[in-house]
Amino acid sequence: MAAAAAVEAAAPMGALWGLVHDFVVGQQEGPADQVAADVKSGNYTVLQVVEALGSSLENPEPRTRARAIQLLSQVLLHCHTLLLEKEVVHLILFYENRLKDHHLVIPSVLQGLKALSLCVALPPGLAVSVLKAIFQEVHVQSLPQVDRHTVYNIITNFMRTREEELKSLGADFTFGFIQVMDGEKDPRNLLVAFRIVHDLISRDYSLGPFVEELFEVTSCYFPIDFTPPPNDPHGIQREDLILSLRAVLASTPRFAEFLLPLLIEKVDSEVLSAKLDSLQTLNACCAVYGQKELKDFLPSLWASIRREVFQTASERVEAEGLAALHSLTACLSRSVLRADAEDLLDSFLSNILQDCRHHLCEPDMKLVWPSAKLLQAAAGASARACDSVTSNVLPLLLEQFHKHSQSSQRRTILEMLLGFLKLQQKWSYEDKDQRPLNGFKDQLCSLVFMALTDPSTQLQLVGIRTLTVLGAQPDLLSYEDLELAVGHLYRLSFLKEDSQSCRVAALEASGTLAALYPVAFSSHLVPKLAEELRVGESNLTNGDEPTQCSRHLCCLQALSAVSTHPSIVKETLPLLLQHLWQVNRGNMVAQSSDVIAVCQSLRQMAEKCQQDPESCWYFHQTAIPCLLALAVQASMPEKEPSVLRKVLLEDEVLAAMVSVIGTATTHLSPELAAQSVTHIVPLFLDGNVSFLPENSFPSRFQPFQDGSSGQRRLIALLMAFVCSLPRNVEIPQLNQLMRELLELSCCHSCPFSSTAAAKCFAGLLNKHPAGQQLDEFLQLAVDKVEAGLGSGPCRSQAFTLLLWVTKALVLRYHPLSSCLTARLMGLLSDPELGPAAADGFSLLMSDCTDVLTRAGHAEVRIMFRQRFFTDNVPALVQGFHAAPQDVKPNYLKGLSHVLNRLPKPVLLPELPTLLSLLLEALSCPDCVVQLSTLSCLQPLLLEAPQVMSLHVDTLVTKFLNLSSSPSMAVRIAALQCMHALTRLPTPVLLPYKPQVIRALAKPLDDKKRLVRKEAVSARGEWFLLGSPGS
């Protein structure tokens, strides 16, 4: 029995010896993994592996010893978690001893120590022992890169798990690491080494007397000068090294006396990258430095920064210089001073003011902006700095404004003033009387009002911005100042067309200031606008002149712009709605553009109300019933219908009202939306008009039952409301509503109504939760579509219903969407519906504005376009190849629409297979196909030049042909593509250069300015092709 057991035990050991022999002597690599796997599975122990290695570990031949230790180390790397404490002790002693061995053995020894540094069972004291042995026995920088990396890994492992033990070494550990790192050149190792240095400092290891040595061993790499080789497999970028080294240099104030002179030297050098790196590093240092570290270097730092901002041609250097100055000032501002200490901030700011003040007064104003930027960078660092600089600079700038008479000079000075005023907004003052602006308020207001009355538009624009900033200062402006300001803004809001930018700025400023000073604007602006509106109504009655018409439009825009406070909305909204009623009641010459302008103002007001729940609900419950009442009244049959009533039912006007209702509904809370829906749905289904103002109508409102097209057209307003509701709002009588919508969607007598019904049905389908009721609605829709698509007068309406239902399901990833898309694809071959089906793919891929929007709470999956592309483009391509010649353009059009709206990163990998079809689409006579395809190709020329250059001959020919297209939009797009072609590799393009330059001479004489502009741009790029520096 004993003999049998011995044989069984000997058999596996024999296998182990065989594997060891194959690795050590046979130089095979595979056995190491096998041995490690056997140890992990429990077939062998580490001790048995050591015994099997036996004499190989003591072999007089270094290479044999190295192979034996390599095998043991590889086993330990895989199995270090299995080791017991006593095994770790013996292995550590063995490996430490082998550090004295032949240099060929050292790499394998280090691998073993790396494995042991990961052991949880490592007894206390051994980490210190290992590192001492490495520091003493190994000349690390003579090792290959991979072995140096192993040493850094050993140190990192011990720092992570044995921090207190290593700290017991005191400064000896720091000195040992300095020796290890000294002379390191490989970027892979430097990243690890910099991280170790950072940890030494941030985790409070003792640096002892070696602070300067540690600084020297890291700062010698500053600034980083490293360019990664092409196709670098390690992926290390120069920026990685820069940031890692910067983290070290800026990690401790103890480096300051060595680092600051170095930074000053590099800022003053001629190397742009060194300047940038130094200024960014200085910026980082200021976060940890105090006055003590900066004190002796402040004059030199200021001189260097000043010189760079004054003299540099690089915007990046200027920006970094200003950022560094800001950080320096912030650092000096936050330092706590002793009572007897010098206030370095005060003296530093005095130097800045002394060097910059006189430039603000120079007649030629050459260094005005650099000086202002420096002063603003310092002033923006702290409240104390801001007060000091502002109180010194503002009197000077105010004086200069009055000294200079030219508008351009005054604009420059006012822009500088504006910069300093904006900085004041950063700081709050408990005692408003201490605010430095108080003493200059009257002068500032006077200066701003002068700017607002200046003939120069540019000066007026700066004046408006300055007024807005002054107004944002709490309790600065008096009531009289505000009254004057409102008067100026009123005047500027009615400027002529050539001052459009000023008018827009004035409207924006009115909105900003009205939110802060609602009483002033209610008292002084709203009454004036109300009067202006009344005058506008009178002019409409008389048949107005164009100038009066434009004033009326300006008034409407001003009313919406100023509606930024709940109290003002309660005044301005009734004015606009009353205006609509007045137009309705009077004998005014109402045009659709007038009503659309009012609706646009209402929509803008609704957008502003979205920020405040109270205003949002007020607008909704006030404006929506009013608009619905006007529309319902307009839809009623009358013997002599008024002009307005006809206007209110026009497509464009209804679309404008849809926009108002949708905007006013999207931000309602579910509770308030639920209140509203109980009124509006019954209005359309049951004719319940009780909640409408002035609801005495001559007949019942029954849009679904009534035969009049006027009432049916108002389904668009129902759509705007119900399709903007939050998803969790329950819609009353939903089943009846969906059936009525479905029935109306296939009514051929009024395309506008049927389309609105189809969109409304689709919008509700998209939000409806999955379940039996949704399935029933879908089945009804499919049956209706199939019935309508047969022969008959409703084919077009059935197709529209199919399209919108498909879109609703595509957006939410509903399983039926693939069947409906396939049905749509089948219609591409239909003689009557084929072109419309092709355009339908544009609708499926586009964002809508009135229904199925994220803002309207529709269920829109993030990557629906990518999914649609993956699921359907192969079928489109296949269908194109199989289609008869007369149908192919429909497939090309559909494909072009899909690709044009696809995110380019998704399209690029598929480009080689699809490009031939896109090029064929350029030959399609349909302008829509051409434009869509050109829009798709232009970004691809910029992002995939290598693929596109394979087809350069075809591209040049087709783009040049299309540059003479009858369609202006196609001509412009073709010329933009010709411009983009110049991004392809120059050698590929040069043979075509003469031909292209000749061909592009023709569109230079195009009758349309925008075409000529693109032609000049494209031809200029082709002229430069191949020239030096291009």
Swiss-Prot record:
Effect of K993R: Impairs MAGEF1-NSMCE1-mediated polyubiquitination
Tissue: Ubiquitously expressed with higher expression in testis.
Residues that bear Phosphoserine: S1027
Post-translational modification comment from the UniProt entry: Ubiquitinated; undergoes 'Lys-48'-linked polyubiquitination by MAGEF1-NSMCE1 ubiquitin ligase complex leading to proteasomal degradation.
Result of altering K1002R: Impairs MAGEF1-NSMCE1-mediated polyubiquitination
Function field: Key component of the cytosolic iron-sulfur protein assembly (CIA) complex, a multiprotein complex that mediates the incorporation of iron-sulfur cluster into apoproteins specifically involved in DNA metabolism and genomic integrity. In the CIA complex, MMS19 acts as an adapter between early-acting CIA components and a subset of cellular target iron-sulfur proteins such as ERCC2/XPD, FANCJ and RTEL1, thereby playing a key role in nucleotide excision repair (NER), homologous recombination-mediated double-strand break DNA repair, DNA replication and RNA polymerase II (POL II) transcription.
Record's protein name: MMS19 nucleotide excision repair protein homolog
Organism from which the protein derives: Homo sapiens (Human)
